[in-house]
Amino acid sequence: MAKYLTQIIVMGVQVVGRDFAKALRQEFAASQAAADARGHAGHQSAAASNLSGLSLQEAQQILNISKLSPEEVQNYEHLFKVNDKSVGDSFYLQSKVVRAKERLDEELQIQAQEDREKGQMPKT
């Protein structure tokens, strides 16, 4: 009976070990993908996120913007007026809208600067 109990325990440990190793590999792959995505954003964008307290993705969600363009950032005007305190809405929401617009403006400036730098680089 002890022999069977030992076999059951060993088999259970093997199954758990395999599943743990598989989960560890998946987590490692996911963290590598996230690191690659952050790496493409650039150091200036990360610094802008730290200063404003909002990531680019959060700012886009607040202003309901799918892609970053100056035309879509104009959605800010509507959301700012709708959440005006004098109309009876929340000053907190209005300040979130303002911070989101500031963050997107910073990102647009960073992109414009990067485009200018790419244009000035000599072609080889």
From Swiss-Prot:
Q: Where is this region: J-like?
A: 58-109
- Gene3D superfamilies annotated for this entry? DnaJ domain
One Pfam match: Pam16
Biological process (GO), any one: ossification
Q: Which GO terms describe its cellular component?
A: TIM23 mitochondrial import inner membrane translocase complex
The entry's keywords: Membrane, Mitochondrion, Mitochondrion inner membrane, Phosphoprotein, Protein transport, Translocation, Transport
Compartmental location: Mitochondrion inner membrane
Q: What is its main location?
A: mitochondrion
Keyword Transmembrane on entry = no
In the record, Phosphoserine modifications are located at 69
Give the matching InterPro entries.
J_dom_sf, Tim16
Comment block on domains: The J-like region, although related to the J domain does not have co-chaperone activity.
- Outline what the protein does: Regulates ATP-dependent protein translocation into the mitochondrial matrix. Inhibits DNAJC19 stimulation of HSPA9/Mortalin ATPase activity.
Q: How does it assemble?
A: Probable component of the PAM complex at least composed of a mitochondrial HSP70 protein, GRPEL1 or GRPEL2, TIMM44, TIMM16/PAM16 and TIMM14/DNAJC19. Interacts with DNAJC19. Directly interacts with DNAJC15; this interaction counteracts DNAJC15-dependent stimulation of HSPA9 ATPase activity. Associates with the TIM23 complex.
Q: Which family does it belong to?
A: Belongs to the TIM16/PAM16 family.
Protein's UniProt name: Mitochondrial import inner membrane translocase subunit TIM16
Q: What is the lineage of its organism?
A: Eukaryota, Metazoa, Chordata, Craniata, Vertebrata
